[in-house]
């Protein structure tokens, strides 16, 4: 059971160092001048932008998008935007510039979806754009989620994006109503990544307990940007390195198709079984492995494309590293909330399931006297359940009679005598 405790181990670069040698060269090259602690965080922050660059590639039996949803949190002024998110910003700027160039060439008449959009976008405008995204993954970005979301009481009317973010992660259909000249119902199947930054309070104010319960938070990798005391020079990329990056992104944008490799699936299942075995009887912990296992697949296939469909072993190593971070992140940040939700759900399940009712009815029969009346059954149910009326009591008595557990020894005569029943000894 020792392995179980590793689920809650720290996320820092000493515990879970960035795999420089196994990571795709594009990622390693963009983060190599940063301190180790920020190489780890900036590599993770790059995933959404690179998923957009590989936006035509899908994976698995259901052709899911290589979407990643990352929320970076750290102290105000600690360098989240300047360091952890800087490589991602460079990729985003190239993708956006290419978008602008394409529009300029057709004099702005193309109704396509921008590759990178701000978190401040309204749900209506986002839906309109996503209708034109085709089979491409796009992303939302904000370097300060508190200004994008709005007030502390849940965000403004334009930022109720949880449902679209959740659907966009898996590329499943999302239906919404909005009104222009006439009423219109739009159905979209978004492929949506995002990168958001903020202080811990701002990030977890948006991805709150409600978001945990509805599933939005489960898909997010929360990346902790650590405080670094030593001075670090601002990230700068040479003209040559930017040109090489532009060429690489151009290649990635030309890629399409669906990836589904047995070697990847075998590695993911082996990792998943290992983690599940360490959970014992903890059902919540076992369920929380599922999304990191899916992230394992996504990160592996993304790395495989970045490696030009070579070095599959390194791609699997990198995917496992991302999955390990995602799992530890989930266990440290949302496990306790999930456990509380399970307690509530357990109570609902246990009082609505056939198994519960069967067990309860057996206890009731054992507690009743050897000879009892219909009213005795009603009184017992009132004392031990949230009683909702007498309609269930006749059915319970009928089942007991049919199964040979009781017999009727006196018929009811209205306003004269009650029906009486007697237990039958087994």
Predicted segment positions?
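Phosphate-handling catalytic cores of nucleic-acid transaction enzymes
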Residues: 1-426
């Amino acid at each position: 059971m020792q392995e179980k405790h590793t689920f809650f181990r720290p996320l820092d670069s000493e515990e879970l160092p960035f795999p420089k040698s196994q990571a795709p060269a594009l990622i390693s090259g963009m983060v190599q001048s940063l301190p180790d602690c920020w190489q780890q965080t900036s590599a993770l922050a790059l995933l959404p932008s690179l998923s957009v660059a590989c936006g035509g590639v899908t994976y698995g039996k259901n052709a899911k998008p290589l979407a990643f949803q990352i929320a970076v949190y750290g102290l105000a002024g600690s360098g989240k935007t300047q360091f952890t998110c800087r490589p991602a910003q460079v990729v985003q700027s190239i993708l956006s510039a290419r978008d602008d160039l394409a529009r300029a060439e057709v004099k702005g008449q193309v109704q396509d979806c921008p590759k990178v959009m701000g978190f401040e976008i309204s749900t209506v405008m986002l839906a309109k754009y996503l209708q034109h995204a085709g089979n491409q993954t796009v992303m939302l970005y904000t370097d300060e989620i508190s200004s994008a979301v709005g007030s502390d009481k849940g965000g403004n009317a334009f930022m109720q994006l949880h449902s679209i973010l959740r659907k966009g992660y898996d590329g499943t259909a999302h239906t919404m109503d909005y009104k222009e000249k006439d009423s219109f119902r739009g159905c979209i199947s978004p492929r949506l990544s995002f990168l958001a930054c903020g202080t811990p309070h701002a990030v977890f104010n948006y991805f709150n307990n409600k978001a945990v319960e509805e599933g939005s938070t489960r898909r997010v990798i929360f990346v902790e940007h650590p405080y670094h005391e030593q001075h670090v020079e601002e990230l700068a990329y040479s003209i040559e390195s930017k040109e090489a990056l532009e060429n690489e992104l151009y290649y990635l944008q030309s890629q399409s198709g669906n990836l589904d490799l047995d070697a990847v699936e075998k590695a993911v299942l082996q990792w998943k079984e290992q983690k599940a075995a360490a959970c014992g009887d903890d059902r919540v912990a076992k369920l929380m492995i599922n999304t990191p296992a899916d992230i394992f697949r996504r990160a592996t296939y993304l790395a495989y494309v970045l490696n030009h469909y070579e070095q599959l072993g390194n791609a699997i190593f990198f995917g496992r590293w991302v999955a390990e971070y995602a799992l530890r992140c989930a266990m440290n940040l949302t496990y306790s909330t999930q456990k509380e939700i399970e307690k509530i759900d357990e109570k609902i399940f246990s009082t609505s399931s056939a198994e519960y009712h069967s067990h309860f009815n057996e206890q009731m029969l054992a507690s009743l006297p050897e000879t009892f009346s219909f009213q005795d059954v009603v009184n017992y149910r009132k004392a031990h359940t949230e009683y909702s009326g007498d309609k269930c009591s006749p059915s319970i008595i009928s089942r007991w009679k049919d199964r040979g557990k009781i017999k009727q020894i006196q018929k009811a005569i209205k306003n004269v005598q009650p029906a009486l029943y007697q237990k039958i000894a087994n």
